[in-house]
Amino acid sequence: MTDETNGGVAACRPPIARREPVKRVFHGDAVIDPYEWMRDKQSPEVRDYVAAQNAYCDARMAGLAGLRGTLFDELKAHVQETDMSVPVRMDGYWYFARTREGSQYAVQCRVPVRGEDDWTPPEVGGAGDEGGSAVGAGSLPGEQVVFDANREAEGHDFFALGGLSVSKDGRWMLYGVDTRGDERYDFRIRDLDTGDELPERLEGIGAACFTPDARWVFYVTLDDAWRPCEVRRHRVGSPVEQDEVVFHEDDERFWVGVGMSFDEHSIVICSASKTSSEVWMLSTATPEGEFSVFIARKDDVEYDVSFACFEGAGADGADIPVAVVYHNAQDPNFEIDVIDMRTHQPPYTLGEGVRVAVGSPYGCARGDDMEAGAGAKPAGTAYSNPANPRILQGAHGLAIEGIAIHRHFVTLAYRTDGLPHVAAMTKTQAAEDFLAGRPWSFRELMPPALDGDWDVPGRADDGAAEAAGGTLPGATHRLYSIGTGGNPSYDAPRMRYTFSSYTRPGELHEYDPATGHDELLKRARVLGDFDPREYMERRVWVTARDGERIPVSLVWRRGHEPAADSAMFITGYGAYEISSDPGFSVARLSLLDRGVLYAVPHVRGGGEMGRAWYEQGRRLNKRHTFEDFIDVTAALQDAGLADAHRTVAYGGSAGGLLMGAIANMAPQLYAGIEADVPFVDALTSILDPSLPLTVTEWDEWGDPLHDADVYRYMKSYSPYENAPEGADGEAGAGAASTRSLQRQSWRPFPRIFATTSMNDTRVLYVEPLK
């Protein structure tokens, strides 16, 4: 791969693919694609070219072998490989996972509960020692291995667990595995008493669930485009050929899922597109019956429903069965309605019942930006709860993201000011509020603070919050992610929630809504010389070219304050209303310890600031995503926080599309780009409805097949259509007529490291290969 006369890496030559013109014509626009022939995955020529690209990559990276080894050693030195999760109770057992040093996969285990009122999990290790004292010890009394993925993966080049559930009596396990990497799972049923498996296999399916008595399995099948489209019913012990189709979705925009309701009284089918949804239900008391629709679908209306009961809340002491409906029919940031199922009959309509909570209109906190400092309410500030449905009146752009109702408490997940939040209340109070026709009285869970000894919850040291060189005046310094987690049991008396930040390892807490008592159950252990107080995190706001202000998260190591010559690693996503929330990463420490500034622009297209933030970065507004990222990069560099010659950007999947776009639109801002399974041939893929996922993606990107405006708009930013000339003098498809930005002669195109998978069904290998 090298020419020894020119010496080493400098002489590496990339493999040059042959060109075979393939013409496509849509909306009167003819495009010649010279590399479409690479779509044939079985072609020996394609396989050889992939091998040549991999060899070229290995040759170019050979000089970094020492650094890669060092980074691996640093990562391993921080990781607690032998560990144990905090057990969660489901029916008669405590379930938990063990990881062991040198093993690739976790081992799922369980121990019997000590009695019906046993809600104290077996000891994992004290919170003060970060859960590290007992995790490496032997088995707990009565411990049983439920599923050892290391053993199951033997003999397979690829292995992924696609679901695992245990029957209510604890005897039968339903599990699915993928040994091909194509996200089609083979499900089997195992007797946990004997280890034997039943003869029937549900092969190549998407998901499956038991009924509580384990006599029936409901499962989802996929069509040729990998779309989950059908639900079938299987009687355990019978041939799969006798399985019955109970639901089929004809609309190719919709994906289908099936599962048990939280109270285990209903089997629930949800069919959803990117913008609308529909729920069907069947009582577990009559699993052979027919499903009935809960609320009929409506364009651009999403909803979900939880079935629960206000135990003993009726006038005569009877239970009140309720449906808790989460929807956006009247508010784009969602609301919660509670329907008394004694007085309302299906099919229901959105807006029935008592409106107990609602989001608030979009309007992000106009906090500190790179140009001027306007006072912003710090993230995590408590808000009042007046008696009306807008549960947190001081919030900006509050978006409700989900609700869960348990026997003893109710939890609400929402976000405001660009950060996730959790609120809770007792079930008793929820019933009282509902019967009185008033909003629910949620109490916000406050994130744990950081004090001198970081093992002891306290208050943050505001005096240490000064930004580098005064360039970030008054920036918000409490960045965190908080969410409900580890609450699989309807009967649990207390709720669990998770907490983490860019600088603080993940924590699992248990909270009692009745008393307000908060207990730290476990903190992820980071080995070696690690002190979270040595790392800084800030939220700043950058004004984009259209006047919108973009929240940006910054992380660096104390003593390496950002400066004009600093290296910067900047990452983004901005699609599907997915939020890039703060989270801890051991691997990130190696960057920060070397003085690299870590930056996350929360660009439009994500969900950080509510539904309007998403709408401003999709379909015919998609260019906002790319422009936001570019404007943030430029602002940070212009503010003297990073050097363009030392700036590297990262994005994966839809974030890989972002990487391709910024490389074409503003190559001068980036020295390098890492694109992980990048969606860089977006227009070609979205034009072909026979490809996996295409039709359902029209709700996200628009439909260029039938809409000429969408076609032209997508072509204006699709990275493959707009690629500048390469080193070999060739251009991407359509580059001669639609190139959005010619390479600037004074600034080389960024160096790009791209990765893909030959069996990826979401972003086909051919896109980054082309």
Regions found by a protein language model. Give the residues of each.
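Cap/lid segment of the alpha/beta-hydrolase catalytic domain
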Residues: 146, 150-164, 177-181, 513-517, ...
